[in-house]
Amino acid sequence: YFSEYIVDLGSEKFGLIVMENRPEWIYSFFSVWDKRSAGIAIDANSNPNEILYVLEDSHPNVIFCSDETEKNVLEAVEKYSLKGSIKLVNVDKITIEQEKMDVIKNMQFELDNPTGDETAAMLYTSGTTGNPKGVMLSFNNLNTEMEGLYEKGIFDHRDQILAILPFHHVLPLTATVLLMLKYQTSIVFVEKIASKEIFDALEKNRVTAIIGVPRVFKLFYDGIKQQIDAKF
């Protein structure tokens, strides 16, 4: 639906995504891919100046945001030197028309994504030693990463993967978002990265895999320890 009716984008362009982890993040990314263009993913908590820096550095043609991020995005766009050439899409303000959905259901659809050495995504470094740098990743780069993970036998199509790492990092982008597309794994979202919400998601959704970093597993440890300490 996003690709057919929301995104007006030529090939070899950029679409910037500034929003929290949610299904619409994935719809936005793949709708950009379906135009044979590249997705730029940045932290949903980016402030207006950080967003403006990315705009001036990459010159995207469309920005996807949410109600949660729209204020900062609008403030950045207002200062952007090419603000007249960019389209803003707030995914929370999209109205899904049933008639159009019915048309899509009857379509033969295959994602027309970038291939080979074509640029598929741009991710920005943290900028701890200076201004963030945009790192362009080709489709081959991402595909190699996915296949390397899958060949380890950690995941298969039966898995329910908990999405707790922000999608603007390469690990969750490949091991959660893109792995889901290629191998039909399922994604479970949490609204807040806190031990209670994570434990609730694990229980309710029969999560079988978690892509994490030490800080995430420290949350698990702290949550379990608090529950144990509360009993004594």
Language model features with spans:
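Conserved coil-to-alpha-helix start sites within the AMP-binding
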Residues: 19-30, 45-48, 165-182, 193
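Conserved AMP-binding/adenylation subdomain of ANL enzymes
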Residues: 143-160, 167-232
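ANL superfamily adenylate-forming
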Residues: 68-116, 224-232
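Conserved AMP-binding/adenylate-forming
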Residues: 2-46
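Short hydrophobic alpha-helices that are characteristic scaffold elements of the AMP-binding
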Residues: 30-37, 57, 178-182, 221
